Structure formats: C-alpha cells, structure tokens
Amino acid sequence: MAMKIPKSGYNRFMKEGAQHFKGTDEAVQRNIEACTELASQIRSAYGPNGMNKMVINHIEKLFVTNDAATILKELEIQHPAAKIIIMATEMQEKQIGDNTNTVVILAAALLEHASNLINMGMTPQEVAAGYEQAAEKALEILPSLVVKEASDMKNIEEVRQYLRSAITSKQYDNEDVIADLVAKACVTTCPANSYNFNVDNIRICKIIGSGVHTSKVMNGMVFKRGAEGEIRSAQDARIAVYTCPFDLTQTETKGTVLIENADELVNFSKGEESEVEEQVKAIADNGVKVVVAAGKFGDLYLHFLNKYKIMAVRLTSKFDLRRLCRTVGAQPQARICAPAVNLLGHCDSVSVTEIGDENVVVFDKNSETGKVATIIIRGSSQSRIDDVERAVDDAVNTYKALTKDGKLLAGAGAVEIELAKEIESYGAKAPGLEQYAIKKFAHALETLPKAIAENAGMPTTETLTKLYAEHVNGKKNAGIDVWKREVMDAVAHNIFDLYAGKRLAIKLATDAAATILKVDQIIMAKQATGGPKPRGPKQQDEDDDGMA
C-alpha cells in the first residue's frame, strides 16, 4: 500500500485547489501591482482631454466612455485588492456622483509610493500610519482653500458656472450646451427649500438623430410612444390617470348564452355599449381631455373616447405613472370611473409630436417652475447619447451636492498642488519614520494635476514646476489651462471643484490604500463548481420606455 505524505503549511487543512500568499513580496507587493495596473488603465481617461475607453461587457453591450465609474463597473474585475478600490469608487459615485477617477488614481499613487518605501525598509504599518496622518492634515487644510460658496441655487447663470467643470471632464467642447440644459432643469424643479432637491425629478429622454446641440429641456415629461386613439393633442387639459387597463373586464369563468332571435342578439351587446358610453360620457362631463392608463385600451372604449374628443395615452411602467401623477398633480384611480375634479391633474399642453423619426407624447407645463423636468438628448449614435447622459447625471448629482454643501474649491489641479505644498512642509517637521510617508502622500497628490497635463499633451515636469512656482508666490488658485497649455487662475476662469467631493475622495482613497497595505496574507478557497442552475430574475415592469 502506497504511503500518504501529509501536506505542509496551509495546504494541510485547506481543500485541494485553495491558494495562499503570504508576506511582503507575495501579498503586499502583488496587491500594489494589481492596483497600479488598474489605475494605469483609467489614468488616461482623467481630465478634460481624457481618452475614451471602448468596453464590451459580458452581455456584449458596447460602452464608449471616459467615465471611471462606468468603466470599472462593466469590467467585472476579480482581483480582491483591486475590488477594494472599486468599492471606494462606488461609494464616491453613490454619495457625490463625481470624482470617481480621482479616488482610483490617488489610491494607486499612494500604493505605488508605498511600494518604494517598503523596498527601502519601512513596514507597511508605518506607511499606512503616515498616510492616515497626512490625510488628516489634508482634510484640516482643505476648508482654508474654499474660494466660493454657492448661495443662490435658483440663479441659472451662477448654477451653470458651478456645473461646467463636472461636465467638461466627460464632454469636452459640449460643456456649455449641457451645463445650460442641466442648470435650467435643476432650477425649474428646485423646491422652495433647495436642500430637499430630488435628482429623480430630472428625467432624460434619449432620441437618436441630429446632434448634441439640438438637445433641449422642458418643464414636464416626454414618453417615447404615440397616442392610442385619433386625438393627437389637447390644450389646457384636465388629466385622469388609471392604474388599470382601460377595457372591459372579463370574468374568470366562461358563461353560455342562449339567443333565440335576432332582437336578443342586438340587445345583448347594446347593454354593454351603453354602459361603456355612460362611463366615458361621465369622464368627459368632468372636463377630462386626456386619459392615461397603465394597461391596454379596449376598442369599444377607444371608439367612445374618440367620439367625446378625449386623448388616450398608454404607459406600461408604474414608475412612469407615478412620475406623471407628480408632474400633473393627479390622483391615480384603481378602476374605471369618473374621478372627482380635485383628483384630476392639469397640464397646459399634451401632444404627440415627432422628434427625429420617433413619435413622442409631450406633457408640457408652460411655467417657470414644476415638479418634474425632462432633458431630451439628441446624438448621432446610441453610445454617444449614453455618454452625454452620464455627463448630465454627473452634473445633476453635482447640483444635488451643492444644495447640501455649497463650498467650492479651485479646480484644474490647483487645490491638489496647494495641498501637496502644505503637506510637504508639514512632513518636513514631523518626527519619526512617518515623515517619509507624509512626504510621499504629497507626491501622490501631484499625480492628479500631472495626469491632466499628460492627457492634454503638455510636458508634465515643466508644468508642475510652473504650478509650484505660482503657488510658492502665493497664487493658491493657479491651475492648468488645457486650452492655452499654460498656467492660469482657475477661479477667474470659473473652474471649480466640489469641496464635499474632494474631501470624500481623499478620505476614501487613503482608507482604501491603508486597507490594502495592512493585508499580509491572501487565502483563496477553491471556487465552487456545478450545483443547481440559479433561478432567473422575477418578472418585473418593462423598462422605463427610454426614460433614464
């Protein structure tokens, strides 16, 4: 009988196929390599001149974008250390909606500099402690770098300036058009207390054709579908909304009817017709000009709706119905009836129009303020429209963040250089080995303006030297002008960064880097194979019909 030799180390009590990495070289340096490799893919997408990435996900959907959050989400990265950075970017996206690329680049730069310090003999714990100390100091300095505070969130001109930077990094050359659209939409739907602004009140309707410059914003809602009946428009309309199909209900059991003569046959359907007409007439008598239903419209009901000049619109999504009720101020009805006047909604204009080759129903409130605004995005291709949508989404989230905290910092890399300068001098005075890590934190902050300059085709070392020279002379707002390829005053050019966004990005990037540095072992169990087939998703509503 063959002798069985026991395995050594972790393999003794782990399943066959499990992997185990231990120590600085195997675990820490491997993790750092993975994170820096991830950041090198994303770095070229940073800033106004950032390059686009073409990503094809697992269901073969094509994405052409420079939005870091979208790229990382669709890549489905498996490396556990890289996943920690991705989780940090997801948190940034969820809370602020912008600066996701900043988190990845800064975290990877911190890890890259940490690798050099570890090779020089410092322990990962000492490096992590130094980074945390430097981040604490950076967050202490940051409030003193605030250059402006957004106070009037209902002034379109001011709001447009605040949103331009968030859009420029995604849609270079279209920032003025998109900033104008988003500013109008946000100001239109902003409640009396701007703190209660809801991003869900800004809807997006994407229609292929023409160009981005023909995009427009309107106070109301747009649905990518036509009207059900013959009536195509209604002015100053009362609107009745139903959550049920606008049709005759069928009984579950089948009945048999004995008809003995022609009169009985005629009278059999006459009662049904008169009942339907009574219902539609009662609705018309209440002044209703538009009926919106969640299900299909029956032929008999459509006939009488046309007869009484009532427009019929079908919406298949319950979410669309809810938003429409909020827009027009209607109370949805669970069954077909003539609702009381106070339960009806009102809209200045409801019409079916053609945008490009698409029929759309437009609920237009011709007023300065409203509950819901829709941005109609035009573009030459689906991927182009999707990318503009992401820029709009970032801008709306920026507006939301400004309503919570209106502080603004100088953009174009100005705040990073000023922080790096301050932390460098702080590190020189710090005792102990942490001072090396604090200085490296300052160097890591330089990576962000360096990436802006690099992507704009500018000489990075020369640009950073000029920036430092300006900041040493007391010009705290000196940033990179990617248009003229020189150093300029970011505030004078209305280039701002969100204080809340930058603060959270520094915190998340430092936490992610410190977490990865404190890992000295990676233990990976063998992946499970086989097993029962997972259940498919439950039946849900249809998609939002082109609405985002």
Swiss-Prot record:
Pfam families on file: Cpn60_TCP1 (PF00118)
InterPro entries with a match to the protein in the record: Chap_CCT_theta, Chaperone_TCP-1, Chaperonin_TCP-1_CS, Cpn60/GroEL/TCP-1, GroEL-like_apical_dom_sf, GROEL-like_equatorial_sf, TCP-1-like_intermed_sf
Gene3D superfamilies with a match to the protein in the record: GroEL, GroEL-like equatorial domain, TCP-1-like chaperonin intermediate domain
Record keywords: ATP-binding, Chaperone, Cytoplasm, Nucleotide-binding
Region (Disordered): 528-548
Annotated Gene Ontology cellular component terms: chaperonin-containing T-complex
Keyword Phosphoprotein: no
A single GO BP: protein folding
Localization terms from the record: Cytoplasm
MF terms (GO), sorted A to Z: ATP binding; ATP hydrolysis activity; ATP-dependent protein folding chaperone; unfolded protein binding
Main location: cytoplasm
Family under the similarity heading: Belongs to the TCP-1 chaperonin family.
Complex formation: Heterooligomeric complex.
Role noted for this protein: Molecular chaperone; assists the folding of proteins upon ATP hydrolysis. Known to play a role, in vitro, in the folding of actin and tubulin. Required for correct subcellular localization of pgl-1.
Record's protein name: T-complex protein 1 subunit theta
Organism encoding this protein: Caenorhabditis briggsae
Gene that this polypeptide is encoded by: cct-8
